[in-house]
Amino acid sequence: MQVTETLNEGLKRGYAIKVTAAELDAKVNEKLAEAQPEVEMKGFRKGKVPMALLKKQFGQKVMGEAMQESIDGAMNDHFTSSGDRPAMQPEVKMTNENWKEGDDIEVSMSYEALPDIPDVDFSAIELERMTVKADDAAIDEALGSLAETAQNFENRKKGSKAKDGDQIVMDFLGKVDGEAFDGGAAEDYPLVLGSNSFIPGFEEQLVGVKAGEEKAVTVTFPENYQAENLAGKEAVFECTVKEVKKPVPAEIDDELAKKFGAEDLAALKGQIAERLEAEYAGAARAIMKRSLLDALDDIVDFDLPPSLVSAEAGQIAHQLWHEENPDVQGHDHPEITPTEEHTKLAERRVRLGLLLADIGQKAKVEVTDAEMSQAIMNQARQYPGQERQFFEFVQQNQQMQQQMRAPIFEDKVVDHVFAGAKVTEKEVSKDDLQKAVEALEEE
């Protein structure tokens, strides 16, 4: 077996691989010998079929497997001895297209090698971590929101008109073309005006009604309405308003706290403070992570595999095009050519991706089974009632597992770098933190 270098420019590599006919024949004989003990053929006991007969009967079938295994073996030996790591799947072509049995196998292999990644002195990286304390105003605001969610409704004075935010209790009957339809009727139905829980335009027409009033509400079902027989059709709902109620926020006291699982109001305030500060810390971490990535991008430089940059630039361009053209589904659109800006962003992403992967490998960072299970459970909650199916889907889908593992791995590597960097804390206001987050989102 011979491997001859044909290209070595930057990260581009090319090799000519030759597997001799004798080596291939030996591989075929080896595979036939492995199979011989299990082969049954008329006139012979199991495992006693002569090799010559086996070769005549199964040689052609085994030949293809032997060729593939020989080429794969040559490639694996090359990568082991050279230390090269291909950036993408190597391109392998058979160069003697008129090959026949008894000829040597000649193939060409080309790929882009992953670059050598320089070590980074984490202690030379200076970062700032914003810290925010949950003040009384923020806690009171959160308490007010909780009180609103726990609000009650009480009857307005007789003759009062319903306002946005009020709850009305009504009977209604919906008709399309004069005919009632399934699901279009209810009695004593409570509806909060402005909640947008009904068809667009329905609730607005009930603002101003009084208890005891009857009102016909005319609306048009959306074109994408789930019930196809109603989609896009005009309907008239005959509504009888029985009660008009105003919202009464819950009192902010120990009773409210108990509704939310706290022992008393002081305990609830403590829980809110912890939650707020956890949210602030998460936002501050995102800001510091961006600062870290910017710093790494500035201090580290190495050659990038063109194929990875090209693929990433294409993906960026494709994603941004769809964000600007949300009505276009799938790939039925003109060819999208990445711009210089897309390529520049792709270079940053590829550089940082390779660097973080290298740092993680050297630091032996691993994603544990427990961390993966937690991530799957968190995402499964987005599919109520289908959690088990989602869990099984992920277990059977390696690509999905990798998509979920990648951000966990990245965050663990980032935390590893944080631990070695010079990090100073700076106490700021909630507004300053919010401005920093908004600036981050605008980039």
Swiss-Prot record:
Taxonomic lineage from the root: Bacteria, Pseudomonadati, Pseudomonadota, Alphaproteobacteria, Rhodobacterales
Task performed by this protein: Involved in protein export. Acts as a chaperone by maintaining the newly synthesized protein in an open conformation. Functions as a peptidyl-prolyl cis-trans isomerase.
GO CC terms of this entry: cytoplasm
Gene3D superfamilies (alphabetical): 3.10.50.40, Trigger factor ribosome-binding domain (3.30.70.1050), Trigger factor, C-terminal domain (1.10.3120.10)
Compartment(s): Cytoplasm
Any one GO molecular function term: peptidyl-prolyl cis-trans isomerase activity
Domain note: Consists of 3 domains; the N-terminus binds the ribosome, the middle domain has PPIase activity, while the C-terminus has intrinsic chaperone activity on its own.
Family the entry assigns: Belongs to the FKBP-type PPIase family. Tig subfamily.
Protein name (record): Trigger factor
Gene encoding the protein: tig
NCBIfam families cross-referenced by the UniProt entry: tig (TIGR00115)
Domain PPIase FKBP-type: 165-250
UniProt keyword list: Cell cycle, Cell division, Chaperone, Cytoplasm, Isomerase, Rotamase
